[in-house]
Amino acid sequence: MLLYDSPVSGNCYKVRLLLAHLGIPYERQTVDVIDRSNRRELLGKLNPGLRVPTLVLDDGRSLGESGAILWYFGDGTRFVPEDRYLRAQVLQWMFFEQYDLEPAIAVVRFWVAYSGRPEAFEPERPAKMKAGERVLRTLDEHLDGRDYVVGDSLTLADIALYGYTHVAGEGGFSLGPHAAVRAWLDRVASEPGHVPIDA
């Protein structure tokens, strides 16, 4: 099994984190997230979105999009509840991560820490920062009094949200005001089988 991957991508990290928890071996091929000139040649037949992560299964079939890959491996494991309502809640928070958190926190982090030209994005940054702060407040309010995002144990919702939340500081977001988020990040990082983003 081959994962087309970027070591700095939170979306790729989510997949690596779940595979580590499940003990599933795989090979990695690093894809440059700055220079995209060879994306069509590299991923065109595998992922119409030309994005990482892209996973090629042992039988040659491919999957793109972090959420789809997480669900493929997570469904039927302890990371997806059996209860229908809780399963839907896991999906709700995975969608929240992709529609709200990722477009704000991940984008600013990329601009600031990895683009090599953060000044080019300065006009757009305040609006993205405001959106990211709103996301962090929402997550903090939800986690207040809870150990995990859904239910009483680690699920795909936690893995999906952890990917970019734990590196939000690289984009200039402060987790200081968000005690519940900080406690949850520590809890997720202390789970058996956890691996850091740079592993």
Where do the PLM segments sit?
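GST-like domain detector, emphasizing the conserved glutathione-binding G-site
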Residues: M1-V8, Y13-P126, D140
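GST-like fold's C-terminal all-alpha helical module
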Residues: Y85, E97-G193, I197
